[in-house]
Amino acid sequence: MGRKDKSDREKKSKKRYYEDEEEDEEVIGGESQEAVPAAAGKQVDESSTKLDEYGAKDYRLQMLLKNDHSSRPLWVAPDGHIFLEAFSPVYKYAQDFLVAISEPVCRPTHAHEYKLTAYSLYAAVSVGLQTSDIIEYLQKLSKTSVPDGIVQFIKLCTVSYGKVKLVLKHNRYFVESAFPDVIQRLLQDTVIRDCRLRSAEGEETELITETISSKSAISKSQQDNGGPSSSQPADGQRSGTQVPEDIFSYYEQMDKEEEEEEETQTVSFEIRQEMIEELQKRCIQLEYPLLAEYDFRNDTVNPDINMDLKPTAVLRPYQEKSLRKMFGNGRARSGVIVLPCGAGKSLVGVTAACTVRKRCLVLGNSSVSVEQWKAQFKMWSTIDDSQICRFTSDAKDKPIGCSVAISTYSMLGHTTKRSWEAERVMEWMKSQEWGLIILDEVHTIPAKMFRRVLTIVQAHCKLGLTATLVREDDKIVDLNFLIGPKLYEANWMELQNNGYIAKVQCAEVWCPMSPEFYREYVAIKTKKRILLYTMNPNKFRACQFLIRFHERRNDKIIVFADNVFALKEYAIRLNKPYIYGPTSQGERMQILQNFKHNPKINTIFISKVGDTSFDLPEANVLIQISSHGGSRRQEAQRLGRVLRAKKGMVAEEYNAYFYSLVSQDTQEMAYSTKRQRFLVDQGYSFKVITKLAGMEEEDLMFSTRDEQQQLLQKVLAASDLDAEEEVVMGEVGGKPQFSRRAGTMSSMSGADDALYMEYQMPRGSKASVGKNIHPLFKRFRK
């Protein structure tokens, strides 16, 4: 019994290895679980839903169809899923509202699917939506009556969220609320009473009642025209008469409320600074999580820095909208902004820093990312070069007089001994009071690393930027309480249709396995199988053909390979430059600069180090030859390398290409389907190519059986370590240097590189060989 259980466990762990992200090794500690309110685990109650005779869910009794249902754009299922008609004339009024209150599940061309979750409703309240607003507008937009279970779920999740705020004013912390009864309820708790600041005589300080005037720190531009974002603006205007009056007037009212200067009466009490963490934990336990807001305009303790946006920096409508969610009430809210790769996340970060105008810390996940952030600050803002300091293993600028510091997660989270110079910089970083911390590629960092980084540096406001808020584990939800709720998420197809990102043709190229390679693939059970389907000669030929085809069109091509053995083999045989983990920073920058500006260098090979933070706007073709199992995030990040809008291209035509080369009848095909899920949900479609036209006419490598046999021998001679994925040193979530792996007896005897080969001797050769043998040895042959 025990042996069977063990084998089952091993099978499961082997399966998970490929599906999980690189960072999944870290286990969330018990302490991180404390910071999640009980309401976050609640689900929509579906117990009242009946099934019809065919086993399908029957919603007819719970949801009554409205008379004017054809002019309403959506319906809400009792399980919390919301279905929106993208072709409806009312689409533009519903799109922004649904993004604010729910999580996008799938957004193809004609119908979009969203899901109400506790976290999405928490985010909605945090950006200013009230419980009554959410329910009322949902009822106005719905084709049917909204199920009672959904109304109860919305009330349950939003009744206490957003009611209490932790505000920093004049370097003093206050718990603030517009609801006096909530403040009184909190003060009845003994732990919170202990956190309250007392006067010199030991008496509690008085409650402060004041009227706050708030207005968005980001004003609307003329090009936005005050309307919601839409992929079909003309349709909405043309069909304006079909919009029901109640939907139109209610949207206008909500939009007006968001932009108008508001006066709110608040009640607050001051908190002892050393008790902040204790207070936050206790408020979460009482189901009143504190929203962190930074009143940066009234912060007189931290000096303003001399930094503004350049006149040439023009924000696009969706960038403005995301920033208005962050600065909606004149204060800076902490949270996450989700924009596609190439849609200008860096400009959003720089604009946020210029709006706050306090000391800013930027964290990326590689030294290349640090250099690019520095270039972005110099490009979009008026900041002086001397005010920017970098802190990486290669570049440690002196932090004296620095206003913007740029570093990596691994540099700040480093726990072992540092050099004297690095220790001094770290002490300086810890001593600073940062106004804003920008966390780039925020999805890649495990919870433990976050806690380490966020406890090392003190920041009033945290802004997370990412293109893919997905992970194969459930750790993505930790971002809600470690940083803040999701403030804004853009629609990829909408940005593509408006020309803000490239129009990409996605294709999956099926490469048949050669008979010799497939025979070995079926026989071998170790990780060397990965090498066999990656080094498949037909895949190599397809890659070579696509490179030649696109180079003739003067395209810029990036080839991605997670496996270093395959990366080197492909690049060296095709005589192309390649970048992987051990490549020095200087060599990387030289290769990337040549790729950008040298017309003779049109193709580069990159390992997984280029998945994120490599800014290559010139690239318009991406070929993927090997990948990290079934990781949806990696597929989307790689597509992002070619998503940047192309200059001088016609928007109606495809102007970027994404090829994923897959060996047929292997495990790679299953992984490929899993990887595409996120992009398919965003509205992309993958074209399957089984035969590349014109490939037979080309003179390609490995066209003969002998060449293929030699390649097979080289692959079989490789060790199991060559089949391992690349471990990127210094990268957050990198796997340890040792690992258990299945081996063979030949490995134990040191015969890993030895090959057994049979040769057929021609007939009569024995006799001819015998003639040349010395008579002395002939006696021993008898």
Swiss-Prot record:
* Short sequence motif Nuclear localization signal: positions: 6-17
Against Pfam families, the record matches this protein to: ERCC3_RAD25_C, Helicase_C_3, ResIII
Q: Please name the top-level EC class of this enzyme.
A: isomerase
Per UniProt, the ranges with Low complexity bias are 211-223
Q: Which InterPro entries match?
A: ATP-dep_DNA_Helicase, ERCC3_RAD25_C, Helicase/UvrB_N, Helicase_ATP-bd, Helicase_C-like, P-loop_NTPase, XPB/Ssl2, XPB/Ssl2_N
Q: Where does the Helicase ATP-binding domain start and stop, copy by copy? A: 326-487
Task: Spell out the subcellular localization from the entry.
Answer: Nucleus
User: Can you tell me which residues bind ATP?
Assistant: 339-346
Assigned GO CC terms: nucleotide-excision repair factor 3 complex; transcription factor TFIIH holo complex; transcription preinitiation complex
Q: Which residues form the Helicase C-terminal domain?
A: 541-701
Point to the regions of Basic and acidic residues compositional bias: 1-11
Q: Where are the transmembrane segments?
A: none
Region described as Disordered:
1-47, 211-242
Its EC number is 5.6.2.4
Q: Name one GO molecular function term.
A: DNA binding
- Determine if Plastid is one of this entry's keywords: no
UniProt feature, compositional bias: Polar residues: 224-242
Instruction: Supply the alphabetized keyword list.
Output: ATP-binding, DNA damage, DNA repair, DNA-binding, Helicase, Hydrolase, Isomerase, Nucleotide-binding, Nucleus, Transcription, Transcription regulation
What's one GO BP annotation on this UniProt entry? transcription initiation at RNA polymerase II promoter
Q: Which family does it belong to?
A: Belongs to the helicase family. RAD25/XPB subfamily.
Q: What does this protein do?
A: ATP-dependent 3'-5' DNA helicase/translocase; binds dsDNA rather than ssDNA, unzipping it in a translocase rather than classical helicase activity. Component of the general transcription and DNA repair factor IIH (TFIIH) core complex. When complexed to CDK-activating kinase (CAK), involved in RNA transcription by RNA polymerase II. The ATPase activity of XPB/ERCC3, but not its helicase activity, is required for DNA opening; it may wrap around the damaged DNA wedging it open, causing localized melting and twisting that allows XPD/ERCC2 helicase to anchor.
What this protein is called in its record is General transcription and DNA repair factor IIH helicase/translocase subunit XPB
